[in-house]
Amino acid sequence: MAYRKRGARRETNLKQDERMQEKEDSKNINNDSPKSQLSEKVLSKKEEIITDNQEEVKISDEVKKSNKEESKQLLEVLKTKEEHQKEVQYEILQKTIPTFEPKESILKKLEDIKPEQAKKQTKLFRIFEPKQLPIYRANGERELRNRWYWKLKRDTLPDGDYDVREYFLNLYDQVLMEMPDYLLLKDMAVENKNSRDAGKVVDSETAAICDAIFQDEETEGAVRRFIAEMRQRVQADRNVVNYPSILHPIDHAFNEYFLQHQLVEPLNNDIIFNYIPERIRNDVNYILNMDRNLPSTARYIRPNLLQDRLNLHDNFESLWDTITTSNYILARSVVPDLKELVSTEAQIQKMSQDLQLEALTIQSETQFLTGINSQAANDCFKTLIAAMLSQRTMSLDFVTTNYMSLISGMWLLTVIPNDMFIRESLVACQLAIINTIVYPAFGMQRMHYRNGDPQTPFQIAEQQIQNFQVANWLHFVNYNQFRQVVIDGVLNQVLNDNIRNGHVVNQLMEALMQLSRQQFPTMPVDYKRSIQRGILLLSNRLGQLVDLTRLLSYNYETLMACITMNMQHVQTLTTEKLQLTSVTSLCMLIGNATVIPSPQTLFHYYNVNVNFHSNYNERINDAVAIITAANRLNLYQKKMKSIVEDFLKRLQIFDVARVPDDQMYRLRDRLRLLPVEIRRLDIFNLIAMNMEQIERASDKIAQGVIIAYRDMQLERDEMYGYVNIARNLDGFQQINLEELMRSGDYAQITNMLLNNQPVALVGALPFITDSSVISLIAKLDATVFAQIVKLRKVDTLKPILYKINSDSNDFYLVANYDWIPTSTTKVYKQVPQQFDFRASMHMLTSNLTFTVYSDLLAFVSADTVEPINAVAFDNMRIMNEL
C-alpha cells in the first residue's frame, strides 16, 4: 500500500544523504591536506622563497565556493532523478511480478491421498504365528524333539522406560492401520503344495505353516492326511467360497469380524449417476454419458463424507490456514486459463489514443498503462476464483496516484464480497477511492478516517453523499456478502444474483458516469480530466465487464459444486496478495472467448476433494478410537500429544512441528468429545479381552516378578533348561503392581523384604532375557531392589530372566562342576498356548468373486458444448459481447 512505499523511499533518501555527507567530508579532508603541507614548509629549516599575490588567492576561493554550490545543485538534481527512476522501476517491478508462488509439493501431497481400498489385501490379519521350540532335559541339555507353540509375530518392545500398556496401545494402532475395508479370499488364496488335487488354502502364511507341519517328523499321519485333503469348497449358486486356514483363535476372531463387517456395497449405474454432483449433472453445458452396464458383482466403498466434526475453522488459526492454503493451491490448478485476450500492445495503443497521451505531459496518466499485461490478467482471474473457493482472505496492493487502479478496484469491490478482503486492506482501498475520486467529484472535504472505526469508509460515505446513483452503488458494495446455502448437505458460499447475471456492473457504470459528470470544484482541471479519462476507459468496456463478471461467477459456481466440505468463512492468518494493476489488466484485456472448466478437470477436482475429506474422517475415527483406548489403558496423560501429532501427520498436508501446543491440546479436547466408531470399538474389545493370551505368547512380557532377600535356586523347565522362572505363585505373598503404582504405598513391600519374606508383584511388565552364566554370577539383581526399596519406583522395573542350557555360553561351568545357580528374583511367566492343529483349523467364508471400483467417475464419458454457446444460470450465454 501507499504508506509502506513512502517508508521504503525515506530509507533510501537517508542512505543517499549519508553518502553525500561522506563525499563532502572526503572533499574537506582533501582541502585540508595542502594547508598541512604549507605548515610543514613554514616549520622546516629549509629556505624557500614564496611570492603569492593576495587578490589571486581571494578570487580562487570564491571560484571554489561557487563550484561547490553548483556541484551540490547538480547532485540534488541527479539524486531526485535517480529517485524518480527507482520509483518508476519499483512500480513496474511490483506490477509485473506475479504474487502467487506455486507450491507443487502441497498439490502433490493432496493428489497422492488415495482411497484406502486401493491397498489390496494379500494376507489375513495375524498377531500370532506357530513356532517350533526345542525341549530340554533335566540336566539342561537340548533334546532332538521339538514342540509347537503360538508366539507373537512382532514381539518387539522399545528400549528404555516402557509400559506394557503402551505395547497394547501400539498393537491397537497397528490393527487400525491394517484393518481392511473388505476381504476377498479368492484374491489371496494360494496353492496347497501338499494337496492331492491342487487344492488351495486361504493365504501364503497358511500354506507355509502347512508345509512346516507336513515336513515335521513328529507330525501324526492323520494330520498329514488331513493337510493333503485341505482345499477350497465352492458354492457357485450362492456366490460363496470356503477356504481352509490355520489361525490362532484370537486371529480367527479378528478375521471373522472383518469378513462380517465389510464396507463394500453393490454398485450400479444409479449410484454412479448420483455420485456426480447434482449441479454438474443438471448443467446444460456438460454432456454426460454412461455407456457401460456394470456386472452384478460390481462393488464400491462409500466415501466417508461426514461434515467437519472438529470445526477446524473455529479457534485453530494455523491449522485452518494450512487447509485453506492447500485448497487454494488445488483450486488454482483447476481454474481454466483465459483465452484470446486482447493484444496488450493494441489495447495500450487504443488507451493512449483515448487518453490523448501525445498531447499530455501529466505523468499520472502514463501510470494508467503501467504493468498492464496478459499474464497479470490471467493471474488475477485465477486468484479471485481460487480465493473464493478456498475462502482465503485477500489483501490489496495499490498506488494511490494510479487512478486507473482505483477505478478497477471499484469494479473489484462491486463483484467480490467484502469478507474476502482483510479489513485493513479493504479500508485503505475504500479510503483511497473516496478521497481520490468520490469526494473530490462533489467538492467535499477529504475524509479523515479514524483507525478502528467500526464503519468502513464506504459506509460513512453512503450516509453523506446526496447523489442517488453513487449512494445506491455504495449501498450495494456495503451489503455485498456471500449467501450461505446448503446444497447436497454441503454449506456453500453463494454470490448475489445481481453479480451472477452481471447487472451490478450497470449499477457501477451509472455511479461512474455520475462521478465523471461532476465539476471537481476544489481540484485543478487536469485532475478532473485524468479521472474522467480513467472512467471513460472503463466505461468503454461495459459489455466486456458484464461478460467478465458472468464468466467469473459461472466458473466459481461450477467448481464450487465439486467441494465436499462445508465452506466456512473465517479470516485466515496469511493472505493472498492481489495487485490492483492486475485487476486493471483483467478489465482492459478480457476478450470475448468463453472459458469453462473441462469435465476431466472437474472430475479430478471432485475426486481430490472426496479423497481428502474421506481420509480426514477416517483419521478422526482412528484418533478418537486410540484416545478412548489410551483412556481405558490408563495411558491418557502419557500418550495424548503424540496421538494428536500422529493424527495430523496422517492428514499429509500439515507441518506438525510448527503447530502451536495450545492448538494441539484444543484438538485433543475436541477429539475426546466424539463418539467411537462401532467397528473400531469392537476391535479394541477383542484385544482387551485377550490381553493375557497375548502376554503369554510374548518373549518380552511377564505376568509378574518374585523378589526375595535370599537367593533362590534356578529351576529346571522343559522350554528353557535352568531358569529363574515361576509358573505359579503358590505360597507367595502377592501385591498387585497396579495398586502399588496407584497408591504409592511401598511400606508393606519394604517391610516384607527386610523381614526376609519373598514377595510377588503381580502384573504385566517387560523383562530381559540373559543366557550368559558369567553375568548370572556377577549380578545380584541389585537393580530390582534399588528400584523398589530405595527409589520406590516400579514403573521402570525390568527383571532379568536367566536361561541356562546347552545352547548358552559357558554351560560347562554348570554341567562339569555340578554348580547350582541361584538368583534373588524369579520371573512369573505362564506357559504360552501350545499349537494344536485341529483347534487351529478354521474354514473362512467369503464371496466367490466381486470387483471393487475405486474411481466411479471413470465410467462417465463427458464433453462440453462449444464454449461460445455455454449458458449461465439464467439460460443466456455467459459471454454476450461478440
From Swiss-Prot:
Residues 1-82 are annotated as: 5-fold hub. Keywords: Capsid protein, Inner capsid protein, Repeat, RNA-binding, T=2 icosahedral capsid protein, Ubl conjugation, Virion. The record marks A222, F226, M230, M841, M843 as: Interaction with the intermediate capsid protein VP6. The lineage of its organism: Viruses, Riboviria, Orthornavirae, Duplornaviricota, Resentoviricetes. One of its GO terms (molecular function) is RNA binding. InterPro entries: Rotavirus_VP2 (IPR007779). Residues 28-39 have a biased composition (Polar residues). One of its GO terms (cellular component) is viral inner capsid. Residues 396-416, 424-444 are annotated as: Hydrophobic. Sumoylated with SUMO1 and SUMO2. Sumoylation of viral proteins seems to have a positive role on viral replication. The N-terminus binds RNA. It is necessary for encapsidation of VP1 and VP3. The N-termini of 10 VP2 molecules form a cylindrical hub underneath each 5-fold axis of the inner capsid. It comes from the Viruses. This is Inner capsid protein VP2. Homodecamer; each decamer is made up of two conformers of VP2, called VP2A and VP2B. Interacts with a VP1-VP3 complex. Interacts with the intermediate capsid protein VP6. Interacts with NSP5. Interacts (via N-terminus) with NSP2. It is found in: Virion. Residues 9-27 have a biased composition (Basic and acidic residues). Residues 1-47 are annotated as: Disordered. Belongs to the rotavirus VP2 family. Inner capsid protein that self-assembles to form an icosahedral capsid with a T=2 symmetry, which consists of 120 copies of VP2, with channels at each of its five-fold vertices. This capsid constitutes the innermost concentric layer of the viral mature particle. It encapsidates the polymerase VP1, the capping enzyme VP3 and the genomic dsRNA, thereby defining the core.
